[in-house]
Every structure is written in C-alpha cells, then in structure tokens.
C-alpha cells in the first residue's frame, strides 16, 4: 500500500512538471542571425522536447536532471514577426509570439550602463522611436539581479523582451548603440542587458577566469574562503564558527555587565557579500549563456576607481571568462573608457588613473577589443558620476562593431 502511494505521488510529481524555457526566451525576442541558435530549458526527466521555428523542427530529450538543449541551424535575418513553438510529448506547449531574427549584443556594466534613455541625451531618440508610425525593430531584455556562489541555471526578467515603444526605459548607452547598428544594417537589433549599479568588475567575472589569472590571487581567495567544497573554505568556516562561539561568550558576558558587545565576526570571503567576485556572473549572466550573440559591450569602472593596475588584470579575466563561457574565443568586446569627473585639482585625479589602466588593457589586448574615448564628450562634473551624454559614446562604439564585425 505504501509503495503504491509512493509511486502514485512520484508519477504525479513528474506529471506536474511543466516545460520551461531559459530566461531570454520570451515573446518578442530577437534571435541571432547566421549562427547556430542554442535553445534550452527544463522539463520532466526523459521528456521529449520539440522546437519549431522558421521551417525548422529540432528535438531534444531532457536528461536525468530535467535539463534539455537543442540548436537551430543558422537563421537569416527577418523583419517579419513569427511564432516560436516549443512542445513536449506530454501535450504541453509554449507559443512565443513576435519573434524576429537579426543581431544580438550582450550589454553589461554598472550604473552608467543601467541609466535609462529617458534620463539622458538619448531621450529625444527614445521619444522619436517610441512614437514612430512604423515600429523600429530594436528590443531589449533586462535580466534581474541575483547573487550566487555557484553558477545558476535559471534567471528572471520582469518584462521580458521590450519593444521600442518603451525605449525611454531602455539602457541609454545600449539604445544608442543599437540604433546606430540598425541605421546601417537594417536588421532587427536585440540587447541582452545584465547590468547592476554600484558594482565592481569582478562581480561580473567567471570564477574560473579569476582562478586562472596570476594577478588575481586576492579575488580567488575571497571565493575559495566562502566555498565549503574547497579545503580552504572548510578551514575558513571552521575558524569562523570558532570565532563565533568565542564572540557569543564575550558578548554574553558584556551584556550581563551592561557593557557594549564587540562586533560579530564576519563570514569568510564572499559569503558575507552579495556583489563579490563572480557572484553576479553566477546569478545573472550564467543563466543566459549560451544565448546566441554577436558580441559584448561594457561600461564600468567607477566602483574600481582605486584599483590601479590590477584593474587591467580584472578586465582581462572578465573578457576571457565571457569568451570561455559562451564558447566564443574571438567574441568582440567593446567598452567605454571612463569619463572625466570632478573639478580640476592636483590632489584629486578623478578617474584619470583608471582611464590610464583601461588604455593599458586595450593596448595589451587588441584582439577583437575596442575602446571608446569619451573624455572629450563629457566634461568634468563635480555634481555626479552619471554623465548626460550617453548618445555619442555608444555611437562611437557602434562604429567599432560596424568596422570589425560587419
């Protein structure tokens, strides 16, 4: 009897499992042209999943963990909205509507990448695009922020792929980049945005790339101290719990005497952080890999402005990690050099130091890398780091892409 109930519950659990798609696969998505297109998600183990799009029919079987992946053959660019159908052998299906094929770029960084078009010099562009009688095929998806110690499979996006009617809420730098590409290429342009304000570069970097870079031992140790699956992590947590036990006794005695308790011991490494090395890569980049893209654009540096030359090592690890994770060893990577900031002061160089290090990185890593100078576009602003002119820097970045990739 018990065995029968258990089997019934198990079958019910399998039956209740629904076919799911990875976060970038929503209505109105843009797929990368001229490349194999990975499609993946989850379902009950053993389920057969079929994808139908643009005359292709591809199938895959969910593994023991319920994960499945297939690849569409390279697609031609198309301005025609079509249905992307996903179904399984249990009668479940998803029809994604309004799907286009064109160019897709991954976009990341901190607050100046997050900054919306409606609050920048791109606002007129955004207004014109949102009110255009004929819709311009520029779309953006923004991946929600999750911090994690290990790479995650799933992510979320509040709105999925947004059409250009909502351009005022797009990333300003990404919108101007996409618009410049569209003007020249006349194909749909998609922006896969995974950025977060006030965040250091190492948070967006793949763990293996940090571990393998000889100049990033401090970042590596922060990760290993927090990972109980490593010997270093086990020792760090043993020490933490010993310190915590001692602290509890000291704090208790202090409280009994009416005194002030000392500060509680910190968790080891990045365990007590949420924007530490690799945490945003794990939580909000890994889940969208290997969505097919042409390349990546990057705007960041404020939170690392005191790094000195180690920032060049961190940029090297960022690029190598992304290229490795996507399986694109020649992935194009274009970035903005830091803007001017602060009033002229011999005691305060503003961002001059990190601009120099960004230039050093660029000179030593020229393969499919481009740097956009913007110090002539955004003058020093003592009042804030969020510069207004986000129109022209990304137009310059688009020129890198148009010259090198098209």
Name these PLM-found stretches:
Residues 1-7:
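Sec-dependent signal peptide recognition
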Residues 17-406:
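Cell-envelope and extracellular/periplasmic
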Residues 7-15:
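Hydrophobic h-region of N-terminal signal peptides that target proteins for export
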């Amino acid at each position: 009897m018990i065995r029968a109930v258990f089997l019934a519950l198990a079958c019910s659990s399998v039956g209740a499992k629904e076919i799911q798609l990875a976060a970038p696969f929503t209505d109105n998505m843009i797929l990368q042209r001229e490349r194999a297109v990975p499609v993946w998600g989850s379902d009950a183990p053993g389920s057969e999943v079929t994808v139908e799009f643009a005359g292709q029919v591809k199938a895959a079987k969910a593994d023991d963990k319920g994960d499945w992946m297939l690849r569409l053959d390279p697609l031609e660019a198309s301005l025609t909205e079509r249905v992307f159908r996903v179904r399984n052998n249990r009668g479940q299906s998803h029809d994604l509507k309004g799907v286009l094929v064109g160019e897709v770029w991954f976009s990341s960084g901190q607050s100046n990448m997050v900054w919306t078009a409606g609050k920048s010099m791109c606002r007129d562009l955004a207004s014109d695009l949102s009110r255009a009688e004929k819709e311009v095929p520029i779309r953006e998806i923004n991946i929600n922020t999750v911090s994690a110690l290990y790479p995650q499979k799933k992510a979320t996006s509040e709105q999925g792929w947004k059409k250009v009617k909502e351009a005022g809420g797009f990333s300003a730098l990404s919108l101007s980049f996409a618009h410049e590409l569209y003007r020249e290429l006349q194909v749909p342009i998609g922006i896969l945005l995974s950025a977060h304000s006030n965040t250091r570069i190492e948070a967006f970097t793949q763990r293996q790339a940090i571990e393998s870079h000889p100049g990033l031992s401090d970042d590596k140790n922060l990760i290993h101290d927090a990972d109980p699956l490593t010997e270093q992590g086990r020792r760090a947590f043993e020490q933490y719990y010993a310190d915590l036990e001692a602290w509890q006794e000291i704090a208790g005695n202090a409280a009994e005497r009416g005194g002030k308790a000392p500060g509680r011991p910190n968790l080891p490494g990045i365990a007590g952080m949420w924007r530490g090395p690799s945490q945003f890569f794990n939580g909000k980049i890994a889940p969208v890999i290997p969505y097919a893209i042409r390349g990546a654009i990057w705007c960041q540096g404020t939170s690392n402005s005191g790094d000195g030359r180690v920032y060049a090592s961190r940029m090297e690890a960022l690029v190598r990690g992304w290229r490795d994770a996507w399986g694109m060893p020649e992935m194009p990577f274009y970035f903005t050099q830091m803007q001017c900031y602060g009033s002229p002061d011999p005691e305060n160089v503003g961002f001059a130091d990190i601009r120099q290090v960004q230039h050093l990185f660029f000179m030593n890593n020229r393969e499919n890398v481009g740097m956009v100078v913007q110090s002539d576009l955004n003058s020093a602003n003592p009042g804030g780091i969020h510069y207004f002119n986000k129109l022209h820097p990304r137009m310059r970045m688009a020129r890198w892409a148009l010259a090198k990739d098209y």
